[in-house]
Amino acid sequence: MGAAPSKIVETLLEDTNFDRDEIERLRKRFMKLDRDSSGSIDKNEFMSIPGVSANPLAGRIMEVFDADNSGDVDFQEFITGLSIFSGRGSKDEKLKFAFKIYDIDKDGLISNGELFIVLKIMVGSNLDDKQLQQIVDRTIMENDLDGDGQLSFEEFKSAIETTEVAKSLTLQYSV
């Protein structure tokens, strides 16, 4: 992958928070991460990004970056994903990304089981399953405004906006 095709760059300029120079610098970084020169980043390459492997949600983050569900992250998906976490990413974009981390089956709702799985990834063995299930049940009960037993994006957003979580969803990185 030499210079990014101009059509892709034009689309990225339109759809992301990056300018042309930033996209070019990120393209160079992408090419370094793509060690096998396949044109996409596989899970091992993704995990080699500084700071990513230490994040317990790294696997879920990669799955959300991988918009076409190919199992790899291509250049366009990489830039689009990073754009959300840039300082110029909107609060709503960041909340939608966070929601997708929890919405494992991509049905637009966070079920009790999905919330349990993601929180289990985050807390590991610090809580036993019974304690964690109580937290999950309480979280759903307190925030499920329509009573369907799941959290919609709007319910998730409402719950999160009362905290400082959205502000913390900005990554500092140099391009």
UniProtKB/Swiss-Prot annotation:
DNA-binding is among the record's keywords: no
Binding site residues for Ca(2+) 1: D34, D36, S38, S40, E45
This protein's UniProt keywords: Calcium, Metal-binding, Repeat
Superkingdom of origin organism: Eukaryota
Binding site for Ca(2+) 3: D103, D105, D107, E114
SUPFAM superfamilies found in the cross-reference section: EF-hand
GO biological-process terms attached to the record: biological process involved in interaction with host; calcium ion homeostasis; cellular heat acclimation; fungal-type cell wall organization; mRNA catabolic process; regulation of cell morphogenesis; response to endoplasmic reticulum stress
Residues annotated for Ca(2+) 4 binding in this entry: D144, D146, D148, Q150, E155
Domain EF-hand, residue spans: 21-56, 60-88, 90-125, 131-166
This protein's GO CC annotations: calcineurin complex; cell division site; cytoplasm
Protein's UniProt keywords contain Transport: no
GO MF term list: calcium ion binding; phosphatase activator activity
PROSITE patterns in the cross-refs: EF_HAND_1, EF_HAND_2
Binding site for Ca(2+) 2: D66, D68, S70, D72, E77
Assigned protein family: Belongs to the calcineurin regulatory subunit family.
Known role: Regulatory subunit of calcineurin, a calcium-dependent, calmodulin stimulated protein phosphatase. Confers calcium sensitivity.
Note: This protein has four functional calcium-binding sites.
Quaternary structure and partners: Composed of a catalytic subunit (A) and a regulatory subunit (B).
Protein name, entry field: Calcineurin subunit B
Species, as recorded: Candida glabrata (strain ATCC 2001 / BCRC 20586 / JCM 3761 / NBRC 0622 / NRRL Y-65 / CBS 138) (Yeast)
